[in-house]
């Protein structure tokens, strides 16, 4: 077998056999911009409860397994490796998190300085927003909530770079724009996040028998939001096993999703993904739209025929979506409600452990109340002290004695100093 050819003028520093030189050449190639030698990837699976995040992640990691994993409560971590081209090379590593549990917990993760789209992660970050087609009214609130969380966290992370005068945020945005939208007529209108964003609409098998008009509105809304935010859109079904009469279709959808994720995680946006499945925008079947394929004109708008702002188009689609799927507002209100309690599933309950936990929770709540009361008392004390200082300053300025000070003794009419009271009677 012949060794890889060297380019003219390339210096090889490693002495020894031709294979040692070939290895050095391969390593140098990996260090070049756009080569496969990337840093670790960081991937997050987020979305509503019971949307199938755990199942989808399990099928991505183990495509041939149709096991039903336990529901996730909190955040779960796993990783994936890509085999290296040579035995001596470092394998590409992807850190993968699934964010589950309550909405309040999810917000804690999103707002953490150590997790979710940190400065270290944004260059190779992938976010998969999982929405549940078997709960149509919850699709739009879930999707808009997580899109907003991604944008908010990226904004704060990018701001840290920009304050230091670094151009990385703009470079990431331009990378996404040039690789995915270079030939798209909406390239200057789309929000380019700079990261890989995927919208995975699961449980299509529970939605596919809906009225065609219902399916049309759902597909158009998802396509509009995906295109507006530079995201990939994939319908998925049969994740627990092939659904009746749709085994080949389910397998093709999963295979396409797996190929897409492997590319985004281990290659990234340095190269445009090449997928085996052709884009599918027919609402009568499962939708699959790569980022950069759609246009606002193709998606259309309910009233204004594609004219106007992106926000205006979203408002029109939202209005139609709410009419088609009652309960959207209630879902949003539930998602935005604070103080959601962590609920322990029945099969995991243990009386002694739960009692100890409840005591700890109560102690924590009491401690927080005491801390809040102490802070409030300190604020009141500071305000009172400030008011007294202001009063004293005002009296001093007016020439009046400050509170607690003795007034000077008045002189007698003839100018002699006042006599002190005699203490003789007391002696």
Curated annotation (Swiss-Prot):
The keyword Membrane applies. It comes from Chlamydomonas reinhardtii (Chlamydomonas smithii). GO terms for biological process: intraciliary retrograde transport; intraciliary transport involved in cilium assembly; motile cilium assembly. The keyword Cytoplasm applies. Residues 399-411 have a biased composition (Low complexity). SUPFAM superfamilies: P-loop containing nucleoside triphosphate hydrolases (SSF52540). Keywords: Cell membrane, Cell projection, Cilium, Cilium biogenesis/degradation, Cytoplasm, Cytoskeleton, Developmental protein, Dynein, Flagellum, Membrane, Microtubule, Motor protein. Belongs to the dynein light intermediate chain family. Functions as a motor for intraflagellar retrograde transport. Functions in flagellar biogenesis. This is Cytoplasmic dynein 2 light intermediate chain 1. The cytoplasmic dynein complex 2 is probably composed by a DHC1B homodimer and a number of D1BLIC light intermediate chains. Interacts with FAP133, FLA10 and LC8. It is found in: Cytoplasm, Cytoskeleton, Flagellum basal body; Cell projection, Cilium, Flagellum membrane; Cytoplasm. Residues 383-427 are annotated as: Disordered. One of its GO terms (cellular component) is intraciliary transport particle. It is a peripheral membrane protein. Induction: Up-regulated upon flagellum biogenesis. InterPro entries: DYNC2LI1 (IPR040045), P-loop_NTPase (IPR027417).
